């Protein structure tokens, strides 16, 4: 998250938020990270030794058998839908703020000039909300924390729908703040759910499957679907109808929230969370 913030500030303040130079900056950072990774200590995986593992186990495909468990399968499905929501905000958040330059009254506003910096409030919020997760987990349990995340996604998109760089600036700021809850509460509570619902021999693969459903399949689903819908229904020669776009995203998140509350059954057991270690 801190690296995310640093990248956003660097590209915006150097005037590269919309230029090809941002990819050079990312490439240099990636090379540095790759070199640093070779200096990290070895961490052997739990479970069977590699000699006794099948090829399916070695490449992590054994985790797909978790779909045979109804509750886990339902959780991974909702993870994909929430991953799509994350892709929506990553793909269009900054573009939306920058697009206010089309309106004469906002063309010279700080929101347009520093759109990426303003969006970075979302990541700053992440670092703060993650500190509140232990309290919420103990007080409400994993399912309720996930539901809070989904409600936060509804607010994230809904506030964007009505925000503007003028008297609606507060909505944009609040939208960025609630993003921290939307992102952290599902990702952390979801990871804990996987941790407490799977056997230690398959746990690392299960966590990988969780990430793949959110940042893999979810991102693909969100990108393809939103791109088609926006171009087909919400784009004209005058530009994009951002108000309706964000309202549509908010309705999407609301439907997911209601469906999750109805279909996902999970009994909170505080002892499970307390037993989770590193």
Labelled PLM ranges:
Residues 30-42, 245-278:
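Multi-pass alpha-helical transporter architecture, strongest
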Residues 185-199:
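Intracellular juxtamembrane helix-capping segments at the cytosolic ends
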Residues 12-29, 228-253:
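A membrane-interface helix-boundary motif in multi-pass transporters
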Residues 91-115:
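Short amphipathic helix-loop junctions that connect adjacent transmembrane helices
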Residues 68-89, 177-178:
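Pair of pore-lining "gating" transmembrane helices in MFS-fold secondary transporters
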Residues 151-165:
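C-terminal ends and interior cores of transmembrane alpha-helices
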Residues 42-76, 102-107:
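Juxtamembrane intracellular "pre-TM" segments in multi-pass secondary transporters
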Residues 11, 128-142, 230-231:
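Helix-to-loop junctions at the C-terminal end of transmembrane segments
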């Amino acid at each position: 998250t801190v690296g995310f913030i640093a990248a956003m500030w660097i590209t915006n303040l150097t005037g590269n938020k919309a230029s090809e130079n941002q990819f050079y900056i990312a490439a240099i950072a990636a090379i540095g990270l790759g070199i640093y990774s070779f200096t990290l200590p070895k961490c052997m995986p739990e479970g069977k030794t590699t000699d006794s593992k099948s090829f399916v186990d070695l490449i992590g495909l054994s985790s797909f058998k978790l779909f045979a468990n109804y509750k886990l399968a339902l959780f991974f499905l909702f993870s994909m839908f929430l991953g799509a929501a994350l892709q929506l905000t990553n793909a269009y958040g900054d573009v939306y703020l920058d697009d206010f330059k089309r309106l004469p009254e906002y063309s010279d506003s700080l929101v347009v000039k520093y759109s990426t910096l303003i969006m970075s409030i979302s990541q700053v919020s992440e670092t703060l909300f993650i500190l509140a997760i232990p309290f919420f987990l103990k007080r409400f349990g994993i399912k309720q924390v996930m539901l809070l995340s989904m409600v936060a996604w509804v607010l994230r998109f809904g506030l964007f729908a009505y925000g503007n760089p003028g008297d609606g600036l507060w909505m944009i700021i609040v939208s960025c703040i609630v993003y921290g809850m939307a992102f952290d509460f599902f990702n952390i509570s979801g990871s804990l759910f996987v941790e407490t619902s799977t056997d230690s021999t398959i746990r690392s693969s299960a966590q990988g499957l969780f990430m793949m459903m959110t940042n893999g399949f979810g991102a693909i689903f969100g990108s393809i679907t939103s791109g088609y819908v926006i171009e087909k229904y919400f784009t004209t020669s005058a530009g994009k109808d951002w108000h309706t776009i964000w309202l549509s995203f908010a309705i999407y998140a609301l439907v997911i929230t209601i469906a999750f509350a109805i279909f996902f059954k999970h009994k909170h057991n505080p002892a499970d969370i307390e037993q989770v270690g590193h």
